[in-house]
A protein has these predicted regions:
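Feature captures hydrophobic
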Residues: 1-136
Length: 136
């Protein structure tokens, strides 16, 4: 399956729910998260793609492709190009470091809140990396 698709979103949700590390590190987290991948024709991504994750107290209550409105109004929205997402999912880059370097943009949400949940962000990316998927 390809990353940032409906099937991938559901598989990531299942992976989050199997992750004991995520359950513990995100135990007090409340709020939806949108992960957005920017279009980049050179990398085979013809249109923006975004995944909506209903994250609540260490569990994923559901995940799907985000609507246009959700991609702009979710409490936390992260956006990056395909190359950055590939590096994140390969474990070559950590999410908080990527935000600090400007590779992963925090489009919406509070940076101080994100810092408090740095381990949860790492555990979320680690769980998503367990999903066998390909990039376009």
């Amino acid at each position: 399956m390809e990353v940032f698709t409906e099937d991938w979103a559901r598989a990531c949700c299942e992976a989050l729910n199997r992750s004991e590390a995520y359950r513990v590190s995100a135990a007090t987290w409340e709020g939806a998260i949108v992960l957005a991948m920017q279009a980049d024709a050179a990398q085979g991504v013809d249109a923006d793609r975004a995944v909506y994750i209903d994250a609540h107290q260490g569990a994923c209550r559901g995940a799907r492709m985000a609507t246009g409105n959700e991609a702009e109004t979710a409490p936390f929205v992260f956006r990056a190009d395909p190359a950055t997402w590939k590096r994140l999912l390969a474990g070559e880059m950590e999410p908080v470091s990527a935000v600090m370097m400007g590779k992963l943009r925090l489009v919406r949400g509070n940076l101080f809140t994100l810092a408090k949940y740095a381990q949860a962000a790492k555990d979320m990316v680690s769980a998503a990396a367990q999903v066998e998927a390909t990039f376009p």
